[in-house]
């Protein structure tokens, strides 16, 4: 496999990964946002994919040791960026938390109808209300400061 095919695989994997992030779970299409934490996580997944391809399919992939070292270095940098929330400002924070809260609403809406445990049903109902209130508050701040990062 030549370098252009490896690059194509990496790009395709990145796009597929980015489309499969928390936004997929959003309760509302208006809660879908682009933000750095998803970008970091997808880069991390793609990095690990390259490492696994090197380990498992070294003879087929054509990935050099130099490329592997560069990839591992990038993985370390990305892990550092995730753990320290590098470059995450107010806008990135709020636009990252909205799909996270929206996902909690989606999960809670489903469990409310499936559980027989009244405590879980009440907890899920409380989560739906509180998370929606927090999404509304975050949207108000983003609107007020003109920081919206909506996709749709």
UniProtKB/Swiss-Prot annotation:
Main location (coarse class): membrane
Topology versus the membrane: Multi-pass membrane protein
Record field: transmembrane: 5-25, 36-56, 68-88
Compartments where located: Membrane
InterPro entries, alphabetized: DUF305_CopM-like, Ferritin-like
Glycosylation sites: 2, 113
GO CC list: membrane
Highest taxon of the lineage: Viruses
The entry's keywords: Glycoprotein, Membrane, Transmembrane, Transmembrane helix
Protein name according to UniProt: Uncharacterized protein L153
């Amino acid at each position: 496999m030549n370098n252009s095919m490896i690059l194509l695989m990496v790009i395709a994997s990145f796009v597929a990964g980015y489309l499969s992030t928390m936004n997929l779970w959003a309760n509302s299409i208006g809660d879908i946002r682009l933000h750095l934490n998803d970008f970091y996580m997808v880069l991390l997944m793609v990095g690990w994919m390259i490492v696994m391809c090197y380990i498992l399919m070294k003879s087929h992939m054509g990935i050099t040791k130099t490329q592997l070292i560069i990839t591992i270095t990038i993985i370390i940098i990305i892990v550092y960026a995730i753990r320290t929330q590098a470059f995450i400002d107010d806008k990135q924070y709020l636009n990252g938390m909205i799909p996270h809260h929206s996902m909690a609403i989606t999960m809670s809406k489903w469990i409310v109808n499936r559980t027989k445990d009244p405590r879980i049903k009440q907890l899920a109902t409380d989560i739906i209300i509180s998370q929606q209130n927090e999404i509304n508050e975050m949207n108000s701040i983003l609107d007020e400061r003109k920081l919206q990062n909506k996709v749709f």
